[in-house]
Amino acid sequence: MAARRMAQESLDSVLQEKSKRYGDSEAVGEALHLKAQDLLRTGSRARADVYEDIHGDSRYSASGSGVYSLDMGREGLRGDMFVGPSFRSSNQSVGEDSYLRKECGRDLEPAHTDSRDQSFGHRNLGHFPSQDWKLALRGSWEQDLGHSVSQESSWSQEYGFGPSLLGDLASSRRMEKESRDYDLDHPGEVDSVSRSSGQVLTRGRSLNIADQEGTLLGKGDTQGLLGAKGVGKLITLKSMTTKKIPVASRITSKPQGTNQIQKPTPSPDVTIGTSPVLDEIQFAALKIPLGLDLRTLGLPRRKMGFDAIDKADVFSRFGIEIIKWAGFHTIKDDLKFSQLFQTLFELETETCAKMLASFKCSLKPEHRDFCFFTIKFLKHSALKTPRVDNEFLNMLLDKGAVKTKNCFFEIIKPFDKSIMRLQDRLLKGVTPLLMACNAYELSVKMKTLTSPLDLAMALETTNSLCRKSLALLGQTFSLASSFRQEKILEAVGLQDIAPSPAYFPNFEDSTLFGREYIDHLKAWLMASGYPLQLKRAVPPESREQKTTAQTWASSTLSQAVPQRADHRVVDTIDQLVMRVIQGRLSPRERTLLLQDPAYWFLSDESSLEYKYYKLKLAESQRLNHSWPIVERRPTPAQCAVRAMLYAQAVRSLKRRLLPWQRRRLIRSQGPRGLKAKKATTAQQTSLSSGTRQKHHGRQASGSLRVKPPPRDSSDAAQDCLSEPAKPCPQPSSPGALGPSPRPTGADDSEALPASSRCPSANMDAKTMETAEKLARFVAQVGPEIEQFSIENSTDNPDLWFLHDQSSSAFKFYREKVLELCPSISFQSTGEAGDSVQSPTAGKEGKGEPQEGHPEQEASLEGTEVLPEEEEEDEEESEDEGGEETSTLRPQAGAAKCPGSEGSSPTDSIPGEGSREDQASTPGLSQASSGSCFPRKRISSKSLKVGMIPAPKRVCLIQESKVHEPVRIAYDRPRGRPIAKKKKPKDMEFSQQKLTDKNVGFQMLQKMGWKEGHGLGSLGKGIREPVSVGALSEGEGLGADGPEQKEDTFDVFRQRMMQMYRHKRASK
């Protein structure tokens, strides 16, 4: 009661003195009507009530009724204190001011703006003389310095402010700690009590008002307030200052908040709610505490109730620490905070204008994205936009709550999508504020703010960061408003057709749309006549039925296209449909698309874009199924690998089937011919048909790609003849000992349709491209290349047309050769010295290549040829120049018979009847006439051991009529040839890599490069070696230029050139 009575007496004396000096003041006249109950109620009022009083004041109303009566004095003060144009218009109503349309000449300094409104309120400031204002401003600026920094440390010594400005802070704080008593000899260290509720003011809290009142009343008047009674009370209450540090409320915008204390102190001591931890600071060494000691910091339980909170609760401790760190517990009694708050939107500043614009105006998308994209996401993994846990979704699926994850997202999408965008923007909006606070803390700890210049730069940086946060947070607020506007317009059915609210920002009041937009919307509704109809919630059953009906309609009515799909999304939808149709969209990529913002329509089945996507996909699928199905051909690399695998499989199969015993062979007089055996036609061709089926079936239809297992002859013959490019079926039974006899005319009549059906009627693009390449190669080198291509294209399915000269592809190839080189002349196919052909074969094989597949040649060999012979035959066909061929030429020439020309090769053996000879002739001719078994014409260059035709062989021993075929036993060298040619190693350059013996490899290692790392200074270059066959085209080492795709024909062309050079060198 003594403290309350002293406060009332002090306040009455101050008001009486002020009424004498400012008798004409309207504000002071209002202040003289203070009542005791108002003063008592001020101490216990909640902060929210005070703010309600502030907002309820006429100055903040939009009607414009509250106009300052003290602005003339304020304009005079501006002329004394601030340089620059006036930012205050003649009409002082906030509701009628447009901050966007004002021209702000320059930015006011924060110190000037904050110091305009002082603790006496707006009404009292207007009547101060300029000199009194300067004195009050000085006290406020001193308190501002102390308030903004000295929560953890005092800046007075860091910035070198002398005792003339701030007083001896260190000595006064040290005296307070040691003696715990007030020394009246130092006027700056005496506090007085002003709250009617009995709370005590700290020394720093009463600095500003006491300094100002001391200036107004004079030293003698103020000293009268500090009588013996008051001093005794102060000394008694001194023990409370270490724990209780609340300050009386100084909200001075209304008369009830004018609690003022007088204290004549020329050297103030600036503090803010110091705790015992802060009292331990030694200002000579300037130790910076990292936080407040919550255990010793006691606050009134009736206000915040910290003591009632369980200290063992982690979240309670976090809450208290955050409140103390941010200083929320000091706002209620913080005079400076109240002054700064009252200044907002009262004095015109560009900061307030831009803040209003950013919160109420939605920027254009490109400008908004520019602002947000300049701020990067925080590095901490927890400070990201939260996503729904995948484990939670899996739990829903396991429990059967939802069928798919998309079903769950469809349910939460109406609100979750908008909230995620708000969270994303909030994280970026607070990032600059975090940077400012963090920079201040680091500066204090590292003691970098040691001069006024450093302080000015730090303030400028902080101001810039705060502006960025204001703009970003304002656009986040505007985004939330836009979401609400869209949802409301969607509910009444006006979202897509009504004018956009973004063009009508509301700066007048807090309504969502604003009066201007509502008037415009009313006019638009009257002009358009569009009815307003509130949408009703659709039951789940009807929604599912509607979705099913829409899906059915999209699959049946291909021409129905939505009318209002966003044109910006149409291109994305078209690209997605093409990827789905072409099969280039994997399930993993499709899952990732659901999280891509560009493909948002995949998760919104009710959107027009999704409907357009479904209809477009159904239409594309329908058109795709109506087209002829063209299967994709294998790549050249796949063809090469499969050909190699097929050749290995055939070789291993022959090794298993052929016996290991050497047979004596019969030497024949015929110079050339096909090797034959007595086995049946099906047995002769079973191996060859299986192999040929793999290659030729793939080139004909592209569907037979799996290597079949070894089968019997009937299955092999049926499969061979079932292919579309094969000759007509043979009526003879393939399982018999020999083919059934038929007349030659029948053979001719069936061979002609076969030859007409064998050529591929539909020549695909790959075959055409291969034919063009080969034609250019042959025209460039010569016709000999064609012969070598025919002999060595067994394992290359892309050159199938060389063995079927009646095909359209071969004709196209010959036309291209003649077109590129008109003077070229090909060797005649009917030369007497190079071919052995029967009349029937002459009809069937007219125009066919001179040499067929070595694979067929292997198939026509006897089943008892030695593996060594088989391997050497294959090596000769691949290497084209082995010693075997050159040594066999003279033997074949010596064995040549003059009457060998014109005779047809058969499967008969001397001693057998003529019926078997005649019967086997058409069977073998027909088997070799089709594309499955193309005819082979034997020349002296490819004649090998055991290939002398059967009718020209000389019978040296008596043979039974039924026996196995025999071979001629030549005296062959036991050892391997000295100059045996191997397969060129440089053909495998695609699999070769540099080793540590390579000079370039060693150079790179010396330069610091390691295997597996990229080239370049930062290791961002290529990791794999550059292909040997790729041309650099001027690029430097390690340049990742366009890779040249090498197909099978390129490899084949290189092999042909090397073998051709080797062939000519061996002649």
UniProtKB/Swiss-Prot annotation:
SMART domains with a match to the protein in the record: G_patch, SWAP
Gene Ontology biological-process annotations: mRNA processing; RNA splicing
SUPFAM superfamilies, alphabetized: Surp module (SWAP domain) (SSF109905)
Basic residues bias locations: 975-984
Location within or outside the cell: Nucleus
Positions of modified residues (Phosphothreonine): 265, 744
Function: May play a role in mRNA splicing.
Protein name, entry field: SURP and G-patch domain-containing protein 2
Organism of provenance: Mus musculus
Gene name of the encoded protein: Sugp2
